[in-house]
């Protein structure tokens, strides 16, 4: 006997509402945003649930601060996603917390930029670390190189731990 599997993609309407703010406080920029999502589908481990997904609302927010120290542009954000009316069989954690850190500095009259951007998953101690260097050869012509370095055992970043990558880019703008 032959088993046939039919997959039918389905896209669900997702309603959301939110807002953002940004203000200066001394030498700092404080900013934030929040959104409430109505009707998002999350994967479930419950074999009795049709299609293996369950519909839940969730709240997503971030708070961040930007500043410059010793000519190093610095940005730090805390991000949280909280699933409402949580069910233990949902694959995602009820609260998913992430910190992002961006450090960048320009050299050679702002033609050379060194940058380090990191996502740090607080739930599973995984991370994505993205060092990058870019150089403006002339106006409109830029070269850059960087890495995507995944770290962790499991989770959003750790699942890609053996998939680090190096990339290069040549960009011409006119």
Positions of PLM-derived features:
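Long, well-ordered mid-to-C-terminal structural blocks that present hydrophobic/aromatic surfaces
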Residues: 11-87
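Membrane-embedded beta-strand positions in outer-membrane beta-barrel channels/transporters
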Residues: 16-18, 60-64, 100-102, 130, ...
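Residue-level signature of outer-membrane beta-barrel architecture
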Residues: 23-25, 66-69, 105-107, 120, ...
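Outer-membrane beta-barrel pore domains and translocons
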Residues: 35-39, 79-81, 117-121, 148-150, ...
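Repeated loop/turn-to-beta-strand initiation elements of outer-membrane beta-barrel proteins
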Residues: 27-31, 71-76, 109-114, 140-145
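Outer-membrane beta-barrel translocator domains and adjoining extracellular loop/strand segments
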Residues: 1, 42-49, 86-92, 116-118, ...
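Outer-membrane beta-barrel "beta-signal"
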Residues: 162-174
């Amino acid at each position: 006997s032959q088993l046939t599997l039919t997959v039918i993609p389905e896209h669900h309407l997702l309603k959301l509402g939110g807002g953002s703010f940004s203000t200066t406080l001394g030498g700092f920029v404080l900013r934030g945003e929040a959104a409430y999502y109505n009707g998002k589908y999350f994967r479930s481990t419950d074999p009795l649930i049709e299609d293996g997904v369950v519909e839940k609302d969730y709240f997503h927010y971030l708070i961040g601060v930007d500043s410059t120290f010793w000519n190093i542009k610095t940005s730090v954000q805390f991000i949280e996603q909280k699933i409402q009316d949580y069910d233990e069989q949902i694959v995602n954690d009820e609260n998913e917390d992430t910190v992002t850190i961006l450090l960048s500095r320009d050299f050679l009259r702002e033609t050379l930029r060194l940058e380090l951007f990191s996502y740090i998953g607080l739930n599973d101690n995984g991370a994505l670390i993205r060092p990058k260097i870019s150089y403006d050869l002339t106006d409109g012509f830029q070269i850059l190189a960087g890495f995507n370095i995944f770290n962790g055992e499991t989770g959003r970043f750790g699942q890609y731990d053996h998939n680090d990558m190096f990339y290069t880019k040549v960009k011409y703008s006119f």
